[in-house]
Amino acid sequence: MAEETVIPSYSQVTDEKIQAALTADKGPGAKLVSWQVKDFTKKGDNYACIVTSVIVQYTLEGAQHETTYVAKIGRDMQVASLKTMFRQMFVREGKCLGEILPRINEVMRKIGRREISVAKCFHCCLDEGKEILLMEDLRARSFRMFDRQRGMDAAHATLVLQELGRLHAASILLD
C-alpha cells in the first residue's frame, strides 16, 4: 500500500495576519505587497504544530523590501482528546511568547538587564481553528534549526540551561 501524503493546511496564514505582524515589526507605514509560504522543516520533525516560513514582500517609505517570518500553525486534529491537548499547548505557548515574555523583557530593559533570548512574536491569533504565531525568523541572525536526532553538544546545552535559569529568575519580576 502506498504511503499517504498529508499536505499541511496553511489556511490560517492570511493577508490580515501577515499585515498585523508586519505592522508590529516594521511600523504602521509598512504595507504588504505579497507573501508565500516556504517550508524549512522536514517530514518527521514531529512538531506539535506546523512550523514553516512566510516570505513577505512589502513597501515602506516608497521602497520595496523583503522579510521572512516563522509561522507556527495549529494542527487540525481529528481525535477530540488530541485536539484539546494540542490546543491547550498552543494557547500556552502563544500566551508565553505573545504576552508574558514581552512583559518580562520590558522589565529587564527597565532595570538595565539583558533581555531573555527568544524570538520576537509579531502576531498571535489564538482563535480556535485559526491558531497561528508569526515570529521573528532567527535564521537572519545565523541561528539554525536544531537536529533533534543528533542531540545537543555540551556548549549549546549549557547556553539553553543558562537562559532557562534567567527566565525562571526573571519571572518573579512580574509579581
Where are these regions (language model features)?
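Conserved ATP-binding subdomain of kinase catalytic cores across diverse folds
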Residues: 38-175
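Regulatory N- and C-terminal appendages and interdomain linkers associated
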Residues: 1-50, 57-66, 147
